[in-house]
């Protein structure tokens, strides 16, 4: 499935239902306000390295995990 301008799809991000107009994992990371190099990502249970996020297409009902490092102790 290819997204068209203005089209939104239903996905799950970090266990919560969400909608996005992002066509790729990299676009979703940016849309959610994360710094590209500061997070780890998984799509449907599979790790997705930073270098391939821009070519990793999203589809309805995809399950995405985005993990950002935390500071503190």
Regions found by a protein language model. Give the residues of each.
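Ubiquitin-like/PB1-type beta-grasp interaction modules and other compact soluble beta-rich domains
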Residues: 1-72
């Amino acid at each position: 499935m290819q997204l068209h301008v203005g089209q939104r799809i239903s996905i799950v991000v970090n266990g919560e239902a969400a909608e996005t107009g992002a066509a790729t994992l990299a676009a979703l990371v940016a849309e959610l306000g994360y710094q590209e190099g500061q997070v780890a990502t998984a799509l449907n249970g599979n790790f997705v390295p930073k270098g391939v996020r821009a070519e990793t297409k999203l589809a309805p009902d995809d399950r995405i995990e985005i993990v950002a490092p935390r500071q503190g102790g």
